[in-house]
């Protein structure tokens, strides 16, 4: 079975853990909020009774960023035709860490993900697309 999920809005990466004065680590509020949003979208699409995927999985993440308002007409065209790519934050590795948000819901553990592709590009509508399938299954 394949999973496909579209998350509206500019892509957000997982924030670094923060520490209290006593050394206790905690996840930043922005990250917790975004992970909860991803979970809610998944449950809305697939239902709360979804059986988590088993075995090795392949994951593709497409991050579409909004075109900056300051971009010239030519730059806008280059961005839409994938001749220019976003090289700003968030980093692709921090975007991929958001797979933690679907642990226990879409799959048992993100350790099952054995193949990962993350792509950043510009789009008229900012969003993130996540596609997951068992290894060997047709795309």
Where are these regions (language model features)?
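Acidic, proline/glycine-enriched N-terminal capping motif
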Residues: 1-139
